[in-house]
């Protein structure tokens, strides 16, 4: 059972599917009727007029009507479009159990606890017939789907079949019916002869709750309180019981025939739904609920859907999945239909059956895996109990007879899923969830241990995708290892693109699109179930939900292409065609409009010519495209879609197109628009539009200030007059201040009663007459004349030297693709093209270099774009002043043609930009980046400051090798020298200014070179090994690493190299020493002992300890020799070495003394001086190499390090820097 939809509500007593729309009506025990969309899983409407439980409910087949009957004795007819009850039919005297529409006539059939069945005419709104005869509650009554029959079930333990052909004949003259009914108002309980009982079916031992006709056969099914489901057959003369289905252990509430299969469904108060095989009369499936009793069942008239109502709501379900099993390879589709494997050629549309499948499984094929190399298929079948799942391996016959195809012998085995992994191997996930690899004979070739998984999918040759509860893992079957994984729960289907570069992972409500390495590119959530998908050749994923065909681009953009009536399963997408299978396994081709996703794809891939073509020719409309373009940063493109002025205005502002914004603002004439336009125009320095905006919004203060800063005194005076007319004293005075008009200020102050201020203003500014006349107006008794400040300074606004008449000059930026091309559609389109053609000459670098300047350096008046400048001299070109003869100094006498012809004018080359190598140096403090840029001097300085390098001779070869990798070279034109490319390691986000060079040397390369050094050490080539270790050590400062772990690994690499170089140097020096005297022999033993304290690999440590052991044993220093023997045995040497060591150890332990005193204390930690090869015990002063960390006695400070041969011992440095992280 596949649950498609579930609701939680009061007890559901009635259910009805809409014949066409994905709707279902539920009538509840609390009096509410609910209308649900089971595909979208939403409640559409509620109808609440009944008083008490509603038991009967039914949709009309054609009209927007449904009927309901309740415990309030009322039958109500509703119009769901108008969302109201149209009328109520009264007549029943007790609860109404069921109500059904007739499939043809305007009749409603109702069954009631008043022991009658009534037929109503919903057009005339009257009762046309009463069927009496039952002597207990009538629990159910239904029309026959094609004949004039009614079946009813009653608690009187009978099922009755009624013949209503008399009613139908009578119904042809409606008047007769009405008069008849009116004439029997007193005795209508006893009915008329319009309907007669044809058969009475007795056989149930208790009350019958439900009876229903078979849609096509003369059969009736009934369910009763005796816990039995009975099947009855009838003919014209009689009806009889055929069989009984036993299994329910409580009252059977409802029983229906499956509309298209030989099945019966029943449900019961025992909290179960049971499916019975009609031919075998046995139970096929049982579905149980824990706490809810079932009350009603409904079958969809056209689809394989059922609904069941229970105590806590209802469920819509299918008995089995309807998804066809199919596999696509190239132009071929293989799919399973009616126990045949069929093959469809997409190109020729030829559809043939190639093979008959063996029968036996009662479950449909779950999925299919096709092997084109061997022309073989794997068909997997899922049982309700997963452990019983099987798969079949078939080889498709070469020359199949399409009319009567063969049924080749298939190989069947148990397993959840089988998938091809190679030409002749397939993987099986068995019931224990382990992976088996089998060959074409279905024999196991090997078992593979895999991480916990419950499903497997194909992932290319040798690879599988493994599904667990919350992720998908890419698994290499050959190497038996996990390659990658991505988080997504319960993936159902996996669809690879044709080139296997992308994969779509489909879950119930989600799609994750990943690349080949399983890096998630985008995650899409859907509210409706995702059904299927296929990749378009352009790299767009086309997928279907229950009700839409949609697209998804790998960047995450997705949208709807078209709506679907019924779910389909996409098999292939090519051009405008979507090839698919429907639920009846019929191949179909749907046409789609790919414009929207092609448009978005072109934008994402920056194919602007395609975008422009679509803008001009395609019917791309709608707010979503505009919003998309705006969101993605293409407002200038969106501008050409928009007709709405408000949207045009906001888009124009966003892309800085003041002209279009001004047009839109004029059309809208809204204060807010003018204010916004003013702000943007001000930012661009377009003060003429700013002035217009301030005038439109009457923003006089800002307008005055604009005139002040542009030096437009004439208009400022007008503003002062306007302020005076408006009686705006403050504005009037402010404008007078801006203008520096003292007499006006005195007048304003005098008029507004500020005599003291007016007097001070006049007197301070030397307006003596005015001051005197004001002085006389003061009353000496009441008013004091204010004192004039003798130190007053004149505050006067500066006089404008050059009033700004034109707008602020803007840089000529290169127009975007769209602005340039779309602008050329307008008036100057052809002209623009001509000018471009004419001016692409040798001087094409800069027309702006030809401005004529006057002696003050300003543009001459003729350079403006006034009418006079354009009007004259157009024929001769005189307005450009390029024909004038200038007297040039003789040294500038250049031969004609040298600069591209006399008429070309003076050419100013563009200023040189910063070279990529200089950018590298500017952006990085890592030495290797400076070496790659060729800046050896700065690289040396960095190495000196960071790790103390003072001797650069050994670095010469490394520098040159590294620099050689810093650039690529390629031939452009045959006549030109080679061009250089400068590859960046951060090329994805480098831009023009943030690049840093690609580095050839990797940490892993050095680690691999370390293995060679170990081999040289093992075979005893010490001097060669020391050279190789030193080469690695010197290369470490020339690395670039990305994380802290790699920094730590690099420092560990330095430590390893130091330990080996010091130790091997000690050993080399020891071997050179003479052995004549006792002192010389003691020195040899000391150096061998020191070597055992180097931190070496165990294999080398064994060799070192064996050497020291032999030397000390010969010197008769048995006590020390015993310690070396014990250390040697702890390392686990070979058996023969261990045996000899134990012999020496036992000899030493018999006499545990040292014959001679040596400068070696094994119990006191020490470092070896890398110059003198003597121990520096802990606590003694020590100097270190800043790069390798090698230890030296203080007397060696300032000398060259013996380990690195390039650094200064004891130098104070910043420290090793090989990652940008170390500078944060």
UniProtKB/Swiss-Prot annotation:
Taxonomic source organism: Homo sapiens (Human)
Protein name as catalogued: Coatomer subunit alpha
Expression by tissue: Uniformly expressed in a wide range of adult and fetal tissues. Xenin is found in gastric, duodenal and jejunal mucosa. Circulates in the blood. Seems to be confined to specific endocrine cells.
Lineage, top ranks: Eukaryota, Metazoa, Chordata, Craniata, Vertebrata
Cellular compartments annotated: Cytoplasm; Golgi apparatus membrane; Cytoplasmic vesicle, COPI-coated vesicle membrane
Gene designation: COPA
Clinical condition linked: Autoinflammation and autoimmunity, systemic, with immune dysregulation: An autoinflammatory disorder with systemic manifestations. Clinical features include inflammatory arthritis, interstitial lung disease, alveolar hemorrhage, neuromyelitis optica, and immune complex-mediated renal disease. AIAISD inheritance is autosomal dominant with incomplete penetrance.
WD repeat start-end pairs: 3-38, 42-80, 84-122, 126-164, 195-234, 241-278, 282-319
Record-level Gene Ontology MF annotations: hormone activity; mRNA binding; structural molecule activity
Entry-linked InterPro entries: Beta-prop_COPA/B_2nd (IPR006692), Coatomer_alpha_WD-assoc_reg (IPR047312), Coatomer_asu (IPR016391), Coatomer_asu_C (IPR010714), Coatomer_complex_subunit (IPR050844), G-protein_beta_WD-40_rep (IPR020472), Haem_d1_sf (IPR011048), TPR_COPA_B (IPR056176)
């Amino acid at each position: 059972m596949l649950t498609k939809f579930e609701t939680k509500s009061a007890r559901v007593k009635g259910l009805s599917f809409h014949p066409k729309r994905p709707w279902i009506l539920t009538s509840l025990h609390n009096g509410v009727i609910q209308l649900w969309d089971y595909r979208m899983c939403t409640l559409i409407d509620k109808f609440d007029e009944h008083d008490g439980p509603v038991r009967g409910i039914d949709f009309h087949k054609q009209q927007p009507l449904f009927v309901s009957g309740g415990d309030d004795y009322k039958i109500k007819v509703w119009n769901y479009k108008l969302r109201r009850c149209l009328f109520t039919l009264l007549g029943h005297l007790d609860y109404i159990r069921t109500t059904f529409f007739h499939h043809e006539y305007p009749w409603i059939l109702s069954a009631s606890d008043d022991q009658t069945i009534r037929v109503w005419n919903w057009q005339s709104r009257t009762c046309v017939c009463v069927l009496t005869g039952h002597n207990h509650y009538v629990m159910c009554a239904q029309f026959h789907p094609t004949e004039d029959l009614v079946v009813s079930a009653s608690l009187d333990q009978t099922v009755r079949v009624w013949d209503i052909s008399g009613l139908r004949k009578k119904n042809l003259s409606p008047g007769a019916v009405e008069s008849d009914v009116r004439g029997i108002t007193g005795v209508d309980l006893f009915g008329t002869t319009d309907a007669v009982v044809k058969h009475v079916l007795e056989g149930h031992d208790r009350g019958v709750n439900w009876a229903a006709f078979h849609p096509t056969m003369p059969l009736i099914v009934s369910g009763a309180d005796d816990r039995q489901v009975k099947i009855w057959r009838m003919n014209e003369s009689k009806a009889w019981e055929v069989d009984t289905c036993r299994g329910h252990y409580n009252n059977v509430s409802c029983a229906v025939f499956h509309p298209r299969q030989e099945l019966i469904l029943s449900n019961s108060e025992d909290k179960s739904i049971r499916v019975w095989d009609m031919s075998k009369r046995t139970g096929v499936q049982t579905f149980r609920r824990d706490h809810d009793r079932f009350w009603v069942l409904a079958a969809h008239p056209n689809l394989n859907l059922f609904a069941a109502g229970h105590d806590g709501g209802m469920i819509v379900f299918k008995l089995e999945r309807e998804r066809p099993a199919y596999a696509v390879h190239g132009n071929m589709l293989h799919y399973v239909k009616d126990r045949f494997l069929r093959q469809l050629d997409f190109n020729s549309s030829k559809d043939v059956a190639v093979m008959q499948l063996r029968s036996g499984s009662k479950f449909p094929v779950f999925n299919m895996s096709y092997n084109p190399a061997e022309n073989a298929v794997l068909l997997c079948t899922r049982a309700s109990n997963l452990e019983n799942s099987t798969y079949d391996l078939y080889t498709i016959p070469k020359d199949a007879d399409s009319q009567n195809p063969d049924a080749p012998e298939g190989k069947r085995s148990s397993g959840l899923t089988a998938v091809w992994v190679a030409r002749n191997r397939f993987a099986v996930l068995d019931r224990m969830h382990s992976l088996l690899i089998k060959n074409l004979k279905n024999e196991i070739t090997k078992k593979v241990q895999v991480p916990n998984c419950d499903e497997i999918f194909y992932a290319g040759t040798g690879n599988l995708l493994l599904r667990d509860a919350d992720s998908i893992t890419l698994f290499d079957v050959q190497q038996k290892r996990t390659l990658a994984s991505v988080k997504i729960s319960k993936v159902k289907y996996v669809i690879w693109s044709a080139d296997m570069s992308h994969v779509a992972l489909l879950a119930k409500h989600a799609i994750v699109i990943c690349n080949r390495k399983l890096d998630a590119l985008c995650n899409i959530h859907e509210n409706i179930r995702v059904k299927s998908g296929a990749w378009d050749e352009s790299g767009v994923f086309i997928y279907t939900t229950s009700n839409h065909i949609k697209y998804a681009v790998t960047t995450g953009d997705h949208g709807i292409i078209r709506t679907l009536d019924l779910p389909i399963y996409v098999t292939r997408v090519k051009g405008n065609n979507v090839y698919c299978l429907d639920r009846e396994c019929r191949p179909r081709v749907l046409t789609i409009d790919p414009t929207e996703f092609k448009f978005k794809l072109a934008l994402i891939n920056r194919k602007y010519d395609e975008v422009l073509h679509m803008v001009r020719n395609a019917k791309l409309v709608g707010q979503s495209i505009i919003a998309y373009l705006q969101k993605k940063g293409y407002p200038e493109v969106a501008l050409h879609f928009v007709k709405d002025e408000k949207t045009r205005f906001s888009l124009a502002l966003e892309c800085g197109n003041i002209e279009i914004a001004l047009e839109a603002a004029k059309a809208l004439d809204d204060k807010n628009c003018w204010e916004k336009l003013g702000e943007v125009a001000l930012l661009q320095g377009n003060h003429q539009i700013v002035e217009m905006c301030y005038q439109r919004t009457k923003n006089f203060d800002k307008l005055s200030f604009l005139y002040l800063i542009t030096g437009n005194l004439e208009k400022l005076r007008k503003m002062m007059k306007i302020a005076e007319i408006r009686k705006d004293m403050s504005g009037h005075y402010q404008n007078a201040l801006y203008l520096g008009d003292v007499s006006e200020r005195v007048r304003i102050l005098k008029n507004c009663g500020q005599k003291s201020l007016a007097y001070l203003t006049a007197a301070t500014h030397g307006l003596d007459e005015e001051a005197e006349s004001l002085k006389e107006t003061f009353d000496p008794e009441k008013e004091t004349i204010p004192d004039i400040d003798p130190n007053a300074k004149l505050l006067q606004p500066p006089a404008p030297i050059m009033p700004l008449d034109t707008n602020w000059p803007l840089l000529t930026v290169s127009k975007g693709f769209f602005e340039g091309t779309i602008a050329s559609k307008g008036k100057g389109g052809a002209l623009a093209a001509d000018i471009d053609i004419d001016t692409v000459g040798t001087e094409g670098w800069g027309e702006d270099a030809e401005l004529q300047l006057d002696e003050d350096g300003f543009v001459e008046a003729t350079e403006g774009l006034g009418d006079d400048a354009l009007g004259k001299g157009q024929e001769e070109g005189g307005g450009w002043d390029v024909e004038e003869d200038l007297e040039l100094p003789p040294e500038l006498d250049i031969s004609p043609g040298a600069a591209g012809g006399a008429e070309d004018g003076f050419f100013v080359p563009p200023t040189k930009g910063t070279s990529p190598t200089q950018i590298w140096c500017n952006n990085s403090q890592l030495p290797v980046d400076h070496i790659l840029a060729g800046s050896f001097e700065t690289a040396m300085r960095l190495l000196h400051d960071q790790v103390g390098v003072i001797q650069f001779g050994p670095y010469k070869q490394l520098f040159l090798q590294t620099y050689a990798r810093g650039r690529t070279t390629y031939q452009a034109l045959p006549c030109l020298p080679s061009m250089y490319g400068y590859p960046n390691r951060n090329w994805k986000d480098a831009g023009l200014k943030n690049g840093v060079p690609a580095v050839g040397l990797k940490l892993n390369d050095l680690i691999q070179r370390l293995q060679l050094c170990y081999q040289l050490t093992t075979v005893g080539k010490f001097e060669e090994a020391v050279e190789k270790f030193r080469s690695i050590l010197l290369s470490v400062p020339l690395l670039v690493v990305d994380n802290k772990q790699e920094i730590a690994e690099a420092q560990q690499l330095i430590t390893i190299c130091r330990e080996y170089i010091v130790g091997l140097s000690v050993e080399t020096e020891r071997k050179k020493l003479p052995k004549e005297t006792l002192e010389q022999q003691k020195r040899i033993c000391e150096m061998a002992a020191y070597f055992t304290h180097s931190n070496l690999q165990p294999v080398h440590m064994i060799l070192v300890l064996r050497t020291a052991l032999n030397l000390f044993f010969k010197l008769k220093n048995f006590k020390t020799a015993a310690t070396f023997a014990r250390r040697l045995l702890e390392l686990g040497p070979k058996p023969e070495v261990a045996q000899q060591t134990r012999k020496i150890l036992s000899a030493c332990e018999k006499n545990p003394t040292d014959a001679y005193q040596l400068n070696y204390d094994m119990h006191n930690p020490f470092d070896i001086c890398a110059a003198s090869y003597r121990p520096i015990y802990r606590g003694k002063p020590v100097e270190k190499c800043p790069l390798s960390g090698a230890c030296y006695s203080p007397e060696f400070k300032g000398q060259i390090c013996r380990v690195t041969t390039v650094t200064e011992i004891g130098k104070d440095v910043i420290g090793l820097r090989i990652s940008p992280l170390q500078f944060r």
